[in-house]
């Protein structure tokens, strides 16, 4: 919500942007539902409907398994948003001389890396070399899940103490968000890998459904995580906010 602050007429007016955790969550949930329906819709049209203009173009723009399209940009931006909020919390904690500052900042860096990985599909570059090295198949057909699972386990070990110090509700939300995200990233990826190992061509509606569920779980996990961060700020960092002042350059202020 945007509203004007109650200040005197002769003073500059300030617009306050008020964001509640629930409003943010509702927005992201709506976006996820729209993206999931659009992804399945264009794939259904691709495989079952007669030819129509922009048939393959729409699939490229909206199917969640394609690169550099609308769902990818949504995921990248929400991961960057997580990184920004985590960095904001870390800096606020530093100003208040709070605890676990390095953990908050490390999480910020991790989410920035996840955003870069989402944009550039770095993890997929691990599939072929690991697959050739270990001759993986079945649930490990997409072999990057092996280092992915190891990375997840190491992060869980490192952040166990940090999770323990969080308020109970925040900790539960963090764990829920992580479970959804990992369930999509690794769990559904393994199911998709198993299915892919049984067929010769992944261009079918069944694989499209698997991938859409996978990406939707990832998006849902990120949405819940953003909600948990905003909830943490609003309940346990009361008085913390972000204000943006728009000022003239020094040169213009001197000449005024």
Language-model regions, residue ranges each:
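Membrane-interface helix-boundary motifs at transmembrane edges
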Residues: 91-102, 161-173
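Membrane-proximal helix-loop-helix units in multi-pass membrane proteins
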Residues: 115-157
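Hydrophobic cores of alpha-helical transmembrane segments in multi-pass inner/ER membrane proteins
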Residues: 2-4, 71-88, 146-157, 216-232
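Perimembrane loop-to-helix junctions flanking transmembrane segments
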Residues: 51-68, 131-134
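Interfacial helix-loop-helix junctions of multi-pass membrane proteins
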Residues: 49, 124-133, 191-214
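Alpha-helical transmembrane segments of multi-pass integral membrane proteins
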Residues: 103-111, 168-193
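Short, highly charged, low-complexity non-transmembrane loops/tails of multi-pass membrane proteins
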Residues: 237-256
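Alpha-helical transmembrane segments of multi-pass membrane proteins
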Residues: 30-53
């Amino acid at each position: 919500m945007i509203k004007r602050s109650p200040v005197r007429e002769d003073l500059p007016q300030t617009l306050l942007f008020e964001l509640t955790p629930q409003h943010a969550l509702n927005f992201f949930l709506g976006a996820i539902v729209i993206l999931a329906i659009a992804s399945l819709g264009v794939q259904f049209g691709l495989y079952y409907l007669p030819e129509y203009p922009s048939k393959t173009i729409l699939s490229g723009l909206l199917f969640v398994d394609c690169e550099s399209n609308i769902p990818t940009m949504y995921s990248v931006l929400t991961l960057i948003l997580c990184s920004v909020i985590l960095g904001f919390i870390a800096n606020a904690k530093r100003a208040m001389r709070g605890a676990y500052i390095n953990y908050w900042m490390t999480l910020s860096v991790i989410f920035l890396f996840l955003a870069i990985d989402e944009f550039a599909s770095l993890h997929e570059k691990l599939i072929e070399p690991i697959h050739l090295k270990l001759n993986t198949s079945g649930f490990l057909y997409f072999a990057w899940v092996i280092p992915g699972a190891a990375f997840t386990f190491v992060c869980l070990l490192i952040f166990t103490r940090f999770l323990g110090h969080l308020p109970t509700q925040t900790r539960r939300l963090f764990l829920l968000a992580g479970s959804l995200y990992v369930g999509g990233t690794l769990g559904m990826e393994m199911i998709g890998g198993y299915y892919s190992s049984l067929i010769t061509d992944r261009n079918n509606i069944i694989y499209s459904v698997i991938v859409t569920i996978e990406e939707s779980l990832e998006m849902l996990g990120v949405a819940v995580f953003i909600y948990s961060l905003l909830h943490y700020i609003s309940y346990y960092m009361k008085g913390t906010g972000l204000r943006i002042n728009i000022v003239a350059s020094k040169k213009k202020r001197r000449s005024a």
